[in-house]
Regions:
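Catalytic phosphate/metal-binding cores of nucleic-acid and nucleotide-processing enzymes, i.e., regions
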Residues: 1-115
Length: 115
């Protein structure tokens, strides 16, 4: 069984050559930074639950969000909320588990679906 990281890498490589799509890898998390007096907590990424890939579908400039999961992985409540917000605002959002699912999702987005 492939891990989410392996699936994510395969999707990035497969979709990276699509001239009608621009995708960015979005890392979300928390880190600790020693500031000389103590530890600062640093949060990074767009927002809690934001998708693994965010991007723009050309030529209209439609926002797209892809959440990558392993075959048995489940979206967290924060991820479900993020994906719903993207759809509500007119973007396209999907959970995908393979390159084939990612390609199919992009084609649905091109057809006007919100997912």
């Amino acid at each position: 069984m492939r891990t989410e990281a392996q699936i994510s890498d395969a999707i990035r490589l497969a979709l990276g050559s699509d001239p009608g799509l621009v995708l960015w890898r979005n890392n979300v998390g928390v880190a600790e930074h020693w500031n000389g007096r103590g530890v600062d907590v640093v949060r990074y990424g767009l927002a809690p639950g934001s998708a693994d890939f965010v991007g723009v579908l050309l030529p209209a400039g439609r926002f797209i969000a892809l959440e990558i999961k392993s075959p048995t992985g489940r979206a967290t409540p924060d991820q479900v909320t993020w994906l719903a917000l993207v759809r509500k605002m007119g973007g396209f959002a999907a959970v995908v588990r393979s390159v084939a699912e990612a390609r199919a999702a992009i084609e649905r987005a091109r057809g006007g679906a919100s997912e």
